[in-house]
Amino acid sequence: MFVEAPAAASAGAPSLDELVVLSWNAHLAEGELRDLIGKLKSGELTGRPVNHFVLLVQELYRRGDAVPEFDVHDRSAFAIVPRDPESFDVEDHAASLGLSIFYVPSMRNGPELREDRGNAIVSTEPLIEPFALELPLARQRRVALGAAVRVQTADGPKRLELMDAHLEPLSSPKTLWVFKNPRAGQVRAILDVLDTDRYDGDAVAGVVLGGDFNTVRAGAREDAYRLARKWSTSLAHEDRRDTHMMGRLDYVFAKLEDGWKMKTRRLDERFGSDHYPVLAFFSR
């Protein structure tokens, strides 16, 4: 699903230091996306109003006839329930927020429900050339999302490329779910894409990779983190606090033009989810 924000939603491309990126696992309808966006815009989360942002969201859901009926020969992930049956899904958010939204499901949300769940990129800015990347399969289908937004630089407008990922917490039954860690391979698949021509050249202001890395085994000691952190040459400071009851699972990484740096900060409110959002700020 791809919905472009109305032209008036963003008054020209922002400079990089005017843009905020946030990564958050919304835990389906439990996450209060509208409340988070309202507080972000008002400045309550940053100390100043935010007019330009990109949200890298995991575990949004969609319900309705667009989701095929379950067939007995199909496989499905378990359903994440319960919740208010009238709660907003991604199509409701798209209709009410007036923002650009790109959503791609990774899996069904249970066999009994006409629902699926996946990642979404939500932004005040027009999204350029969005695409989906199916990650190496371990236990459940996982789809990362890519897109770009336009930012203003001293050399004119350029693209800031973004990648939104939700990695696999467990391996397959063949390895008893825990004796093989699939996340490093999924990060390598993402970094292989980020090494292609799209992400190189003078037209690119930088690349941001964020998401729920599900580093449930060892947090920042896992290879998935180490690979992304080594790639992330512009991360000047990162908030190392836990983002979930199981540890530090959520991250934002960046590789930017020379002279630019990024810092991250975990918010102190979960907005109904079981994950804390992670904010990223850019500066020279």
Q: Where does each model-flagged region fall?
A:
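Metal-dependent phosphoester-hydrolase catalytic domains
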Residues: 1-7, 127, 132, 194-208, ...
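N-terminal, active-site-proximal structural segment of metallo-dependent hydrolase catalytic domains
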Residues: 1-97, 103-113, 188-191, 284
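Beta-strand-turn-beta hairpins that frame and shape the catalytic cleft
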Residues: 7-22, 115-129, 140-168, 282-284
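Active-site metal-binding loops of divalent metal-dependent hydrolases
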Residues: 24-26, 59-60, 167, 211-213, ...
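Surface-exposed cleft-lining segments at the edges of enzyme active sites
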Residues: 28, 131-136, 167-183
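Solvent-exposed loop/turn segments connecting transmembrane beta-strands
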Residues: 32, 112-114, 137-141, 269-276
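Catalytic-core segment of enzymes that process non-peptidic bonds
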Residues: 98-135
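His/acidic metal-ligating clusters that form di-metal
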Residues: 146-163, 179-210, 214-215, 219-222
